[in-house]
A protein has these predicted regions:
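Structural signature of hydrophobic alpha-helical transmembrane segments
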Residues: 6-20, 61-75
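Loop-to-helix entry region at the N-terminal start of transmembrane alpha-helices
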Residues: 11-16, 66-69, 86-90, 97-147
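C-terminal ends of transmembrane helices
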Residues: 23-36, 78-91
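Alpha-helical transmembrane segments of multipass membrane proteins
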Residues: 24-25, 53-55, 78-79, 111-115, ...
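Loop-to-helix transition at the N-terminal end of transmembrane alpha-helices
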Residues: 33-60, 64-71
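Active-site cofactor/substrate anionic-group-binding motifs, chiefly glycine-
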Residues: 50, 64-86, 95
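Short cytoplasmic-facing helical segments at TM-TM junctions of multi-pass membrane proteins
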Residues: 151-188
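Transmembrane alpha-helix interface motif
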Residues: 179-258
Length: 258
């Protein structure tokens, strides 16, 4: 099978510009007021991916540099998850503690899965393989942590009285939070579960398309996508579980009743 990689030329630039204009126009004409955020996001993504692509040309040649790059991704993921989960700005007091706490579910979700696929030889121990796989899993764990933390925070704001009532009945904080808030955190798993259930029927996700565009066979693409999907599911379920436990112990959200 020959390569079907995207052509890097003027036509790509025109297509990207047209897609950005389409998204921005829809954001404006719909009344959502998202035209500027869409344009900024598109420019930012272009700059970031260009920079990352240039860096990765060097990074993936060395396992040490690849590991350092993965650590950088974890750091960015922790900062993002901390902000989304707590709703507090990075510049506010206690930011370092919140970022450190948010890094825990990201690491607990991603590290075992990365270790498993590397130890089993499914993914070769080379930079060009480790970085993208680790990036996908870290990103998935980050999203799960952000969504679970945000849902816990929103649910706590609405059902705070129920948590306090459970505490008044003699439950310890961990059990009270589990009883009242844990079901809300489970909604963070709806996107990965839906994606896994409908893969091949409704969607052809990124890994599948990437392998095909890179010249792989449909069987190779399917096997790669299955590995990614199940790895993501494991990482995200573990990340949500860890997020709930941290919140129940008062380490993630600042105002959980005691």
């Amino acid at each position: 099978v020959g390569t079907s990689a995207v052509d890097l030329g003027p036509r790509l630039a025109v297509a990207l510009a047209a897609l950005t204009v389409l998204a921005a126009a829809a954001g404006r004409l719909s009344g959502l007021g998202q035209d500027r955020p869409v344009a900024v996001a598109a420019v930012r993504a272009t700059v970031q991916l260009a920079a990352v692509s240039a860096v990765l040309l060097v990074v993936v040649r060395s396992l040490v540099l690849s590991a350092l790059f993965v650590l950088l991704m974890v750091g960015v993921a922790a900062v993002t998850a901390a902000g989304r989960a707590t709703g507090l700005a990075l510049r506010s007091a206690g930011a370092a503690r919140r970022v450190g706490t948010a890094a825990v579910p990201v690491l607990v979700g991603a590290v075992p899965v990365v270790g498993l696929v590397l130890a089993g030889g499914t993914v070769p121990l080379r930079g060009e393989a480790v970085v993208p796989v680790a990036g996908i899993l870290v990103g998935g764990a980050m999203t799960a942590t952000s969504l679970a933390g945000r849902r816990l925070r929103e649910e706590l704001a609405v059902r705070r009285g129920e948590v306090e009532a459970a505490l008044a009945l003699g439950l310890v904080r961990r059990d009270a939070v589990h009883e009242v808030l844990r079901p809300a955190a489970a909604t963070a798993l709806v996107p990965p579960l839906d994606q896994t259930r409908t893969v091949g029927l409704v969607t052809l996700p990124g890994a599948f398309v990437g392998v095909l565009l890179g010249g792989g066979t449909p069987v190779q693409a399917g096997a790669t996508q299955l590995l990614v999907l199940l790895g993501l599911l494991a990482a995200q379920v573990t990340a949500v579980w860890t997020t709930v436990e941290l919140a129940a112990r008062g380490r993630l959200l600042p105002d959980v009743p005691r």
